[in-house]
């Protein structure tokens, strides 16, 4: 199939200085061909969550504040007078969300320096959009009402969706109840969030590849310095090129397929007008999936260490971002309880659809959703429900102890503190990219 000249070009630029590198990418993709200096611009970075107890190493997790500032500088040079930055960060701990991320990553100072408005989509009023008979998405009004919406995700892989790029970054514009609904056991995560772009209609997508993240999206991924920027007025075109750079074909990604099918758009990168750098020079395949034991009783390390007794089935696409850290915590705590001998037969469930299996003396249910899903489950001998959305970390540890697992909360804290500082002293990992 030949290149579709009616589609917006997709730019690939190397990042080597600010703001010129981004300027090259925007010029190549004709980013401002439909832009007026009178437009109200909304910038949507990826500030997925904020953790004050165990700070998330920012590389590859968050859109670099440096690139956001570069974009603001270029917009100001163009004469733009009204610029907002909006996000709806997940609250790992209640009350610690978007505003904490704005403060911690320099956005508060950025707003003061350039006269910007910061918007917490979690606090916004919303408009509802029906998708068929089963799905209604509540989207923050500010995300819908700007004249020129700029989507700024990070180049990363993701344990539930393979990649997390432009289409998925828009999930941060949803209200909390709609974010949860996307993880509904009878719906499909990637089908659900693929529709958000139909309503927001981003004018421009800029994918920040200064760092790329493998097996994201929070504390546990591995970041690599990559120094690329992908930009296009076509969100799918940008996502296809970015996915290609980290080893994925468009046909590999379910939410790409859903979006492309509705819009009768090609998933073949060869059909797009790629400008700038040669993509072949920047390809580095990244892993996305976490390995589990063959019998689905725990992460792959359980088999390596010879852990028997407990079962922690692999997460599925119903596990929300809020409960994801709790599920990881349970894995680490069970590891801490292992002293070389078989552990009690305890099953630990999360998400919204896992079903307790027969053969376990006790079943720990992490969160309100999985408690409801197993309310009538006759396979469960003795349930240990840990209520909450998400449940509190200390209550998770207490439930595991009640189940007979001698977990070491100190070992968990040490591990998490290690994740926070894992890039310290390593060449190329520069905190200046996340400060103003």
Where are these regions (language model features)?
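N-terminal and secondary-structure boundary signal
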Residues: 1-436
């Amino acid at each position: 199939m030949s290149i579709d000249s009616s589609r917006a070009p997709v730019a690939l630029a190397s990042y080597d200085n600010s703001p010129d590198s981004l300027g090259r990418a925007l010029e190549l993709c004709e980013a401002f061909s439909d832009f007026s200096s009178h437009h109200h611009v909304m910038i949507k970075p990826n500030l997925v969550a904020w953790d004050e107890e165990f700070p998330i190493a920012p590389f590859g997790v968050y859109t670099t504040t440096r690139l956001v500032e570069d974009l603001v500088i270029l917009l100001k040079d163009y004469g733009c007078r009204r610029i907002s930055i909006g996000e709806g960060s997940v609250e790992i701990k209640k009350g610690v969300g978007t505003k904490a991320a704005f403060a911690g990553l320099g956005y508060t100072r950025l707003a003061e320096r350039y006269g910007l408005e910061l918007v917490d989509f979690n606090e916004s009023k919303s408009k509802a959009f029906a998708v068929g008979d089963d799905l209604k998405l509540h989207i923050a009004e500010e995300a819908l009402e700007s004249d020129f919406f700029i989507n700024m995700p990070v180049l990363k892989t993701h344990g539930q969706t393979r990649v997390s790029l432009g289409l998925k970054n828009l999930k941060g514009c949803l209200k909390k109840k709609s974010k949860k609904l996307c993880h509904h056991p009878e719906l499909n995560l990637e089908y659900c969030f693929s529709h958000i772009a139909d309503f927001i209609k981003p004018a421009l997508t800029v994918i920040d590849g200064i760092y790329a993240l493998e097996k994201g999206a929070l504390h546990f991924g591995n970041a690599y310095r990559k120094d690329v920027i992908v930009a296009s007025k076509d969100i799918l075109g940008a996502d296809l090129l970015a996915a290609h750079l980290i080893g994925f074909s468009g046909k590999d990604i379910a939410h790409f397929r859903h979006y492309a099918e509705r819009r009768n758009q090609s998933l073949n990168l060869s059909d797009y007008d790629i400008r700038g750098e040669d993509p072949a020079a920047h390809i580095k395949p990244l892993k996305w999936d976490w390995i589990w034991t063959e019998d689905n009783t725990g992460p792959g390390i359980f088999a390596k260490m010879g852990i028997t007794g407990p079962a922690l089935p692999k997460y599925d696409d119903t596990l929300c971002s809020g409960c994801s850290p709790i599920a990881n915590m349970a894995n680490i705590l069970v590891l801490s309880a292992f002293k070389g001998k078989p552990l009690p037969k305890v099953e630990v469930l999360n998400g919204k659809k896992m079903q307790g299996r027969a053969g376990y003396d006790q079943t720990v249910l992490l969160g309100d959703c999985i408690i409801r899903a197993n309310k009538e489950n006759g396979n469960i001998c003795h349930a240990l429900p840990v209520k909450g959305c998400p449940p509190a970390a200390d209550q998770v540890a207490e439930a595991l102890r009640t189940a007979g697992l001698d977990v070491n909360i100190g070992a968990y804290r040490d591990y998490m503190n290690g994740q926070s500082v894992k890039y310290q002293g390593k060449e190329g990992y520069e905190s200046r990219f996340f400060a103003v």
